[in-house]
Swiss-Prot record:
Reactions catalysed according to its record: archaetidylserine + H(+) = archaetidylethanolamine + CO2
NCBIfam families reported for this sequence: anchor_synt_D (NF038088), PRK05305.2-3 (NF003683)
Function as written in the Swiss-Prot or TrEMBL entry: Catalyzes the formation of archaetidylethanolamine (PtdEtn) from archaetidylserine (PtdSer).
Compartments it resides in: Cell membrane
Phylogenetic placement of the source organism: Archaea, Methanobacteriati, Methanobacteriota, Stenosarchaea group, Halobacteria
Protein name from the UniProt record: Putative archaetidylserine decarboxylase proenzyme
Listed Pfam families: PS_Dcarbxylase (PF02666)
Cofactor note: Binds 1 pyruvoyl group covalently per subunit.
Active-site positions on this chain: 164 (schiff-base intermediate with substrate)
Source organism (scientific name): Halobacterium salinarum (strain ATCC 700922 / JCM 11081 / NRC-1) (Halobacterium halobium)
């Protein structure tokens, strides 16, 4: 299965067309174009996922990059997505979407402190928030949900084309002691339990 929307084909078609034309002209660049198109399709893959037990699940594939208690006492966990990770994001806990807000910004590397000013989409419920953050190469954030929509844990939330980071602010009932992942741990969206 592929990520929702036309983006996979929008990004894969140009290198595929150039690659096929170059191959027809016996140019070795054709292989590069076809390989790039295949990579784009692979990058936008969307495998089925099921949560591994009760609790909050991580919203993104990748590496846990930050676990921090905010000034308001809420816990924020960030997951950095590398190029090899699935980039479809998942719902951490069931809830009704209150708002989906696009915030324009820069495109700094997602692992840097400068990413605090990057483009992002903030998805909020009464209990939790997920922030999808663009990075240096990730220029498109595609939310799948709208305000008023009821979501189940592990549902598809959106995707970021070509990378970056997803942060989740846990429900107020959870504190730092409830978090069962560690910084540097590899996690899978919609499967790995983040907090119990």
């Amino acid at each position: 299965m592929l990520a929702r929307g036309p983006w996979t084909w929008k990004y894969a078609l140009p290198p595929a067309v150039v690659g096929v034309a170059a191959l027809a002209a016996s140019s070795p660049w054709g292989v590069v174009g076809v390989a790039l198109a295949a990579f784009v399709v692979w990058f936008h893959r969307d495998p089925d996922r099921s949560p591994n037990g009760a609790g909050v699940v991580v919203p993104a594939d990748g590496t846990v990059s930050v676990i921090r208690t905010r000034d308001d006492g809420r816990v924020r966990v960030g997951v950095f997505m590398n190029v090899h990770n699935v980039h479809v994001n998942r719902v951490p806990v069931a809830g009704r979407v209150e708002s989906v807000v696009h915030e324009p910004g820069g495109h700094r590397p997602a692992f840097s402190k400068e990413s605090a000013h990057n483009e992002r989409v903030r998805i909020e419920t009464a209990e939790w928030t997920v922030v999808l953050i663009a990075g240096a190469f990730a220029r498109r954030i595609h939310p799948y949900v709208e305000a008023g929509e009821d979501l189940a844990r592990g549902d598809r939330l959106g995707h970021i084309s070509f990378g970056s980071r997803a942060d989740v602010v846990l429900p107020p009932a959870y504190d730092r002691g409830d978090v069962v992942v560690e910084s540097g741990q590899t996690v899978r969206a919609g499967e790995t339990v983040l907090a119990r």
